[in-house]
Structure formats: C-alpha cells, structure tokens
Amino acid sequence: MFRILLADDEGIMLESLKHIIATSFGSECDIRCVKTGRAVVEMAESFHPDIAFVDIHMPGLSGIQAIQEIRKVNNEMIIIIITAYDKFAYAKEAVNLGVMEYLTKPISNKKVILDVCMKAMQRVEEARQKRSDDLKIRERLEIVVPMIESGFIYSMLQDRS
C-alpha cells in the first residue's frame, strides 16, 4: 500500500490527479488531498505519505515552503512538483530540496503522471526492501555477536590453561 498526498489549490487538478492514480492503481494507494501549504505540512505529519505531488503556488505557505518544513523532519518522502511555473529559481530550489520530478502544467498526457508515479512507487519499494534487509542483518548480528564473544572468551580461557 502506498500513501499518496496530492496538494494543489485547484480542485480540478486535485480531482484529475486523484482519478488518474486511483483508476490506475486502485487499492494499492491511499490518497489524500489538500489545498494549502499549511495543510501539506499537517497532512505530512499525520498521514505520513510515501509520495507527495505538490503545487508551488498555494494559499498560505507555498509548496516550496511546505517542502522545506517537511524536510526538517522527513527526508524519505518522495516529492513531485506539479506547477504552472517553469521559472529556473523554483526548479533550482526544488532540486535543492530533493524533489524527484518537476512537472509543469498543463500535463496533457496522463501517461506522464503514471510513469512518474510508478517511478516513485519503485523507489518507495526499494527503500522498504533496504530497510527490511537492514533489520534482518541487525537481527542476525544480535544472535551472532554474543556467540562470537562467548567463543572468544572460551578460547582465551583455554589458552590460559
């Protein structure tokens, strides 16, 4: 299951994104929608999305400001900017904040959204797998280290005899 946050002050854009993702991925996704930068930050804290599609210009906090706040506590969320603004300064700031993609509106082909979404989902899966593998290694070390330590102590005692 992927938790996806959609943030845009344009209701039609939110509904379009939600429809594209929901019809393509169905029950694989839990999708939440917000319309302000502040709501992005609050939803990031309570919903813990894996992936966020964020517009830059929203009421209150901008998308960039919201991402800055989120990055203070969460560097793992995959963020995709979707905006009508293609100014270099915005793109540069987005890259500095670690966004995965910077898409400009209007997006005329839903395949672009689906490709970006699948790429983000793949990254989430890879991160989950890495976390799982790391935990397995730690669990094994918790078992092996005491065995090695006791074997070392035993061999030290044997050498002294």
Task: Locate each region found by the language model.
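Receiver (REC) domain active-site loop signature in two-component systems and cognate sites
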Residues: 58
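Active-site residues of response regulator receiver
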Residues: 8, 55
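Interdomain helical linkers/hinges and coiled-coil/dimerization scaffolds
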Residues: 95, 99-161
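Active-site beta3 strand of CheY-like receiver
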Residues: 4, 47-53
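Helix N-cap/capping motif at the beta->alpha junctions
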Residues: 18, 33-43, 62-66
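Two-component/phosphorelay signaling modules centered on CheY-like receiver
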Residues: 11-32
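Short hydrophobic/Thr-rich beta-strand motif most characteristic of the beta2 strand and flanking loop
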Residues: 25-35, 43, 91
